[in-house]
């Protein structure tokens, strides 16, 4: 009986830790993450203070923080080829990173680090030099900056069969030297690295290439991490938020279900399907059942996004900033519909898959610059600064914890729905106007459309909608309007 009780206690403790790792540790009613891809730490700190916090963002996913290989031309993907766990990259050094984390936490913005636990750098001709000046010989699996030697890696082999579990989890992903996470020594170095970031005040981690590591090894690593640092405003015994990159199209041996109990999982099917819908390849009327009915993970297990730094560069259904009208409609739907843990993308312009972030002649990443409307210039796209997107972050905050209700569609590509009695969204993806009296579910009054403008000094700078005592209002979205979406919420009532 004593043995049974002990086993039950350990089982419950493990379940409790796993559930805790699904909690993003947001501040207040905020509930949207932004990925500031390849931004410098000093610029993120300022963005937290001057833009993200005032507009209600919840957190920032940052690019990998550890030393990486220096590749010719400085492609973005060099950040995903570790040389050591020293916190020096083109985004800044450890002191600058720590300052950024502190300043963002001070204004209620949580930091989530993209971490590389699966591998080190791939082959390099001769001695490679990292962004902190550390030398390594990847072809010999020699990384003195950690240190790792060949015995800390799986034997070299290629992934040729994605239905072969051994190949997927023990061979080299695109030639990257594959760490043996079952080794006590490797585990200790990874835990030490993550714990140092926790000590500096981060709230959690995006785990790159999680499907290429055995779930049992990740479970051990996650379970061995320290609690979040209470000096940065986290409650006692709070666990780091974990969200794992698991690309699962539903037909491979390694599945997302192996990982979703350990933490959230990146729901790539969400990205693909929302792209198909707003590109016109699937009628919007079908989105009424959006979520688990589409084969997605449970809402609290799914990290959701329209695009990410990888798939925005691929050909296919995924939307990106280059289709701005459809992208803004898809993002509005994403942030208005009650499903998933939402993340929005903040990109830099690219012409090909390898385009580096904006940089000067000395290959230093340059800071974003802004025009008079606050939009980014000089090579940065900054979708999070588009009014139509940051306004929907405010919408999502305003309607938090409300249910979907009042669904309407025209049988095709015009839809609307309510979020309780706090918010209303309408979308027109048809080639003709939407002009209709619709139930907004809102209290009577005049509301500003936060897509076309905002509430300033008691007046709307864009469209407005008058809602009658029955909750109905006249909604017009022209087929040639600049934006194909309209959004109202109680915090934008005149």
Swiss-Prot record:
EC number assigned by the record: 3.2.1.1
One Gene Ontology cellular component annotation held by this UniProt entry: extracellular region
Major localization listed first in the record, in broad terms: secreted
Class in the EC hierarchy, top level: hydrolase
Record-annotated disulphide pairs: 48-104, 157-171, 376-382, 418-441, 448-460
Catalytic activities: Endohydrolysis of (1->4)-alpha-D-glucosidic linkages in polysaccharides containing three or more (1->4)-alpha-linked D-glucose units
Cofactors, names only: Ca(2+); chloride
Record's subcellular location: Secreted
Keyword tRNA-binding: no
Signal peptide stretch: 1-20
SUPFAM superfamilies listed in its UniProt record: (Trans)glycosidases, Glycosyl hydrolase domain
Positions marked as site (Transition state stabilizer): 310
List of residues that carry Pyrrolidone carboxylic acid: 21
Keywords noted in UniProt: Calcium, Carbohydrate metabolism, Chloride, Disulfide bond, Glycosidase, Hydrolase, Metal-binding, Pyrrolidone carboxylic acid, Secreted, Signal
UniProt remark on cofactor binding: Binds 1 Ca(2+) ion per subunit.
Residue positions binding Ca(2+): 118, 169, 178, 212
Entry similarity comment: Belongs to the glycosyl hydrolase 13 family.
Assembly with partners or alone: Monomer.
Protein name per UniProt: Alpha-amylase-related protein
Organism: Drosophila bakoue (Fruit fly)
């Amino acid at each position: 009986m004593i043995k049974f009780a002990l086993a039950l206690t350990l089982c419950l403790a493990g379940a409790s830790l796993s559930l805790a790792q699904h909690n993003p540790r947001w501040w207040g009613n905020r509930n949207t993450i932004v990925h500031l891809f390849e931004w410098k730490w000093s610029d993120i700190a300022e963005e937290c203070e001057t833009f993200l916090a005032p507009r209600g963002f919840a957190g920032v996913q940052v690019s990998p923080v550890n030393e990486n290989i220096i590749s010719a031309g400085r492609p973005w993907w060099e950040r995903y080829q570790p040389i050591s766990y020293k916190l020096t990259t083109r985004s800044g050094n450890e002191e600058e990173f720590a300052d950024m984390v502190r300043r963002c936490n001070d204004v209620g913005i949580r930091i989530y680090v993209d971490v590389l636990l699966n591998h080190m750098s791939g082959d390099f001709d001769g001695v490679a030099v990292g962004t902190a000046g550390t030398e390594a010989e990847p072809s010999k699996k020699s990384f003195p900056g950690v240190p790792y030697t060949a015995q800390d890696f799986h034997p070299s082999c290629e992934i040729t069969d994605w239905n072969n579990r051994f190949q997927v989890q023990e061979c080299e992903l695109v030639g990257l030297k594959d760490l043996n996470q079952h080794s006590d020594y490797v585990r200790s170095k990874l835990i030490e690295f993550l714990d140092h970031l926790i000590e500096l005040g981060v709230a959690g981690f995006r785990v790159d290439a999680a499907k290429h590591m055995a779930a049992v090894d990740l479970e051990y690593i996650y379970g061995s991490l320290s609690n979040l640092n209470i000096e940065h405003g986290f409650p006692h015994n709070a666990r780091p938020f974990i969200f794992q990159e698991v690309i699962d199209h539903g037909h491979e041996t390694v599945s997302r279900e192996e990982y979703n109990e350990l933490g959230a999982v990146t729901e790539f099917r969400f990205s693909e399907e929302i792209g198909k819908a707003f590109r016109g390849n699937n009628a919007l009327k079908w989105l009424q059942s959006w979520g688990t009915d589409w084969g997605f993970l449970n809402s609290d297990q799914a990290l959701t996004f329209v695009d990410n730094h990888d798939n925005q560069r691929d050909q296919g259904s995924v939307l990106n900033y280059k289709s701005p009208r459809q992208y803004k409609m898809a993002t509005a739907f994403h942030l208005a519909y009650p499903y998933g843990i939402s993340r929005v993308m903040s990109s830099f312009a690219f012409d090909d898959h390898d385009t580096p972030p904006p940089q000067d002649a000395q290959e230093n990443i340059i800071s974003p610059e802004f025009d008079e409307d606050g939009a980014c210039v000089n090579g940065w796209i900054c979708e999070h600064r588009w009014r139509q997107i940051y306004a929907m972050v405010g919408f999502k905050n305003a309607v938090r914890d409300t249910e979907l209700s009042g669904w309407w569609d025209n049988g095709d590509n015009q839809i609307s729905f309510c979020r309780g009695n706090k918010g209303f969204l309408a979308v027109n993806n048809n080639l003709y106007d939407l002009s209709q009296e619709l139930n907004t579910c809102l209290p009577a009054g005049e509301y500003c459309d936060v897509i076309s403008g905002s509430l300033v000094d008691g007046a709307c700078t864009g469209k407005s909608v008058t809602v009658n005592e029955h909750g109905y209002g006249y909604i017009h979205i022209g087929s040639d309007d600049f934006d194909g979406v309209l959004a109202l919420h109680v915090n934008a009532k005149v």
